[in-house]
A protein has these predicted regions:
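Short, membrane-exposed interhelical loops at transmembrane-helix boundaries
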Residues: 234-253
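...captures the hydrophobic TM-helix bundle architecture rather than a specific catalytic motif
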Residues: 12-17, 37-44, 48, 70-86, ...
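Divalent metal-coordination and catalytic microenvironments
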Residues: 125, 229, 271
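Membrane-interface capping segments at transmembrane-helix boundaries
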Residues: 199-205, 266-282
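Transmembrane alpha-helical segments of integral membrane proteins
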Residues: 49-56, 196, 227-240
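Membrane-interface helix-loop-helix modules in multi-pass inner-membrane proteins
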Residues: 4-74, 95, 171-182
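Juxtamembrane helix-loop boundaries in multi-pass membrane proteins
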Residues: 1-13, 38, 64-78, 140-151, ...
Length: 286
């Protein structure tokens, strides 16, 4: 975790700038429609960052405060990220390229369930990461809770997969119409196969396989989302081409991306390489 923490921060700012520069219409609509959940997500991330840094400087009798701040910051950030994803699936009310919905349009049972579902998904991801990076009693504890978490996540995916086409006919039409059906059909099959492999890996106390298979599950989930919405970047009707910036702006951003991206990837690779292997009691954050 101590290598992933500084390594994942440089990608957030370029990602936001890329959305603003390459798809300004998407940036303006999404930001206006999801202003409150995105702000709360950022507040959670701020709590995480502050707690992570200050815990190691606090006295022993005060560290529990920063532990709780980190836990709640993580939960809030993850929950509202899931809420935003759920609202994205539901779509936005757009007229003449402007958001015309209400401030709380994002607050629905589906989005709240999506927020809870993402907490389960990221909990499993963190659990399997600890299986991969730790040893001893902590690793055994994570092995014990990985299977229940995986089964809960499977139930969440099942509920979302049924709820989405029933509640949103436009998505059902995308799922079950050609050629989208051809692209979408492998996703649920691969999800079930991956879950089976994950449960088998956890049962035999594997170290690395559970985390890798959980990554595959997360990738399949976002792949299903992409297939469900493609080619729209602002559901239900604004396509990626309608929201794109002029070619000159995209060309300018491409030059900057080609320059910056290798540094980010190189730094991330180097961080993971340096901190490869198991974390022991003697290791610490400095």
């Amino acid at each position: 975790f101590h290598c992933a923490w500084p390594a994942n921060r440089p990608g957030r700012r370029p990602a936001g700038a890329a959305l603003f520069g390459a798809f300004p219409l998407a940036y303006s609509v999404v930001l206006e429609a999801l202003y409150l959940p995105l702000i709360l997500m950022l507040v959670g991330l701020i709590f995480r960052g502050v707690a992570f840094e200050f815990r190691f400087k606090a006295r022993a009798n005060k560290r529990h405060i920063w532990d709780k701040a980190f836990i709640w910051g993580s939960l809030v950030a993850t929950f509202f990220q899931g809420v935003a994803l759920g609202a994205f699936i539901e779509g936005f009310k757009v007229v003449d390229r402007k958001f015309v919905g209400g401030t709380l349009d994002w607050l629905t049972p589906f989005t709240l369930f999506s927020g809870l579902g993402l907490i389960v998904a990221y909990s499993l991801l963190g659990c399997t990461w600890l299986i991969m990076k730790t040893e001893g009693s902590l690793q055994k504890q994570m092995h014990d809770i990985a299977r229940p978490l995986a089964l809960v996540l499977l139930a969440v995916i099942g509920v979302v997969s049924l709820w989405t086409p029933i509640a949103y006919p436009q998505i059902a039409e995308r799922w079950f119409s050609m050629p989208n059906l051809v692209w979408f059909m492998p996703v649920p099959i691969l999800v079930l196969v991956t879950f089976y492999g994950l449960l088998r890996a956890v049962a035999r106390d594997a170290h690395y396989t559970p985390f890798l298979l959980t990554l595959v599950l997360i990738f399949l989930g976002y792949s299903g989302l992409g297939i469900s919405l493609w080619p729209n970047i602002i559901p239900p009707s604004i396509s990626i081409w309608d929201a794109a910036a002029p070619p000159q702006s995209q060309g300018f951003m491409l030059v900057g991306t080609l320059f910056i991206l290798p540094f980010i990837l190189g730094y991330t690779y180097w961080s993971y390489y340096v901190f490869r292997g198991k974390v022991t009691h003697e290791d610490g954050y400095h």
